[in-house]
Amino acid sequence: MDIDQYMTDVGRRARRASREIARASTAAKNAALEAVARAIGRDADALKAANARDVARAKDKGHDAAFVDRLTLSDKALKTMIEGLRQVATLADPIGEMSNLKYRPSGIQVGQMRVPLGVIGIIYESRPNVTIDAAALCLKSGNATILRGGSEALESNTALAKLIGEGLAAAGLPQDAVQVVGTADRAAVGKLITMTEYVDVIVPRGGKSLIERLINEARVPMIKHLDGICHVYVDDRASVAKALAVCDNAKTHRYGTCNTMETLLVARGIAPAVLTPLGRLYREKGVELRVDADARAVLEAAGVGPLVDATDEDWRTEYLAPVLAIKIVDGIDAAIEHINEYGSHHTDAIVTEDHDRAMRFLREVDSASVMVNASTRFADGFEFGLGAEIGISNDKLHARGPVGLEGLTSLKYVVLGHGEGRE
């Protein structure tokens, strides 16, 4: 296969389809989503058979249990896909929405209209559920999509793509509006991320090595985040009960997510009251504690152990595991400085009863999501009321934080007049 020619053809067809899908009615888009949902339920056995072949190959290659679990399309996973499609169909359609209309002295009205981005390339690892999630959000937001999943999920993604195409056709929409790259060749990714004439934005969903490669090689703009080095700072004016609840949930609710706390900062004045019960709780749950000298002194005095001495690298590490770095700081100044120096601008939280300090933390911490008296785990499109998300961005341009339907659109200016001319 000539990968360059193949991907160029995919891009050309996506660009053509994007013009049709951009003007599709809400009813047609919702009909397509419902048709895909019904098709998944109808063809569940065929989907599971294709997926079983992917799973068997993954096991033969020695992939671990966590990888295989993400790859597997269980009955529960298929049900979640169907529910997700129907849930996206219930979301308000942002396309064509007018805002900020104002009359100008000249007599014209100036405002903004929300429009699709165009063609979105989604690059992700071997998680077939992303095929449906991404296709649904891009379709509802009026965008064409090129999906390039991990090679281990190729049969699963191909089977899902067939059903998506059927759903689009049933609703009278172009099947090329959602295309799955049908090759495992890595050169396809290299071509996709440089096709500026056909692709408007890339959304990568994957590990750090994938994101780093795309940062270095992509010519198409990206909506992305590299790391989730999230912090909770417990202020010396915090409620101890709230601190324990927030810090427990932020770390132990799920270890492998990008919005899990990786570093705990505690004000010196409240450290014994907070770290003594927290340290015991974390050790009971099997969390390894990597601590600075001050935190070690407090925890050892409380009989908490074993402990590991933290290095500078620990403050820069996204563990995605039951490991937590702990540092005692003098106060909010030091906490904000540490977060802005070592954090990844993803999600950070303060626990405090002091309103002025809370507002200062919100203003000065340079992250996509900043929270007061709440777990970092809330940094999620569903929890934020977006309905669904295609990912989380810690960049500052275009979309920042959880990226839902509006994050897959842009605003253009519109002018309404009555024959006015500029003087």
Curated annotation (Swiss-Prot):
Compartments reported by the entry: Cytoplasm
Keyword flag Amino-acid biosynthesis: yes
Biological pathway: Amino-acid biosynthesis; L-proline biosynthesis; L-glutamate 5-semialdehyde from L-glutamate: step 2/2
Gene Ontology CC annotations of this record: cytoplasm
Keywords: Amino-acid biosynthesis, Cytoplasm, NADP, Oxidoreductase, Proline biosynthesis
Main location: cytoplasm
Enzyme Commission no: 1.2.1.41
GO MF annotations in UniProt: glutamate-5-semialdehyde dehydrogenase activity; NADP binding
Reaction(s) catalysed by this chain's protein: L-glutamate 5-semialdehyde + phosphate + NADP(+) = L-glutamyl 5-phosphate + NADPH + H(+)
Function recorded in the entry: Catalyzes the NADPH-dependent reduction of L-glutamate 5-phosphate into L-glutamate 5-semialdehyde and phosphate. The product spontaneously undergoes cyclization to form 1-pyrroline-5-carboxylate.
Protein's name according to its UniProt entry: Gamma-glutamyl phosphate reductase
Source organism of this protein record: Burkholderia mallei (strain ATCC 23344)
Organismal lineage: Bacteria, Pseudomonadati, Pseudomonadota, Betaproteobacteria, Burkholderiales
